[in-house]
Amino acid sequence: MNLISIFEIVAFIAGLIAYKTIKPTFLKPIVFLLAITVLNEYLVIPYLVSFKKGFNNYGYNVFSFIDMATWFYLFYKINTKPSIRYFIITGAIVSLSYSFIELTFLKDWRQLHTDSFRVYELIIIFLSTYYFYQVMLKQYHNIFGDSIFWLCAGCFLLHLILFINLTMLNNGQYWNLKSSSFVQHILQNIAIFCYYCCITIAFVSCYYSKYLETKQKSRQVLYK
């Protein structure tokens, strides 16, 4: 088990522990997404690899649709502005449709849909940045207690780095570099590491906020 796998499992366990305290409650599907991630990584992918070489991408491609749909739903719930919600719905239809077309007609399911996935990444980067902008407009904002902020931070870092990585991979000249595979591997690990760290912090902030709330109520009862 590598370091990235450990952070992945830690994020999932943190989600299970903090599940009842997660606020806003519409963020709870992230815990189920992490459960599917763990099952995919440790059961589905190993089975597909043992079945036939190259079949592991089937698992990653199917999972990517679940992942994209989940995050589109979450960002839709996060944003209440009609124009942003319209953008999210349009972006979801375009990126999911493009992904299916790329996998079914332009490539095949044994290859990763890198082109369409980059479209999805640009949308997520924009939505995360828009949330940061909304936070900056406030006079005061408790970042640690804002689970949405940390989730957006994780999405922003993950997809920004992966977008750069996938763009470089599509450049034929990039592979002429001796260290290309090493750089690709390092960038991917950094992106995933940042993603799971931020998700874990989001769960910790939910749990800690609930702890402080309970503690404050106990004091109020004590001093009555």
Regions found by a protein language model. Give the residues of each.
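Terminal, non-globular segments
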Residues: 1-224
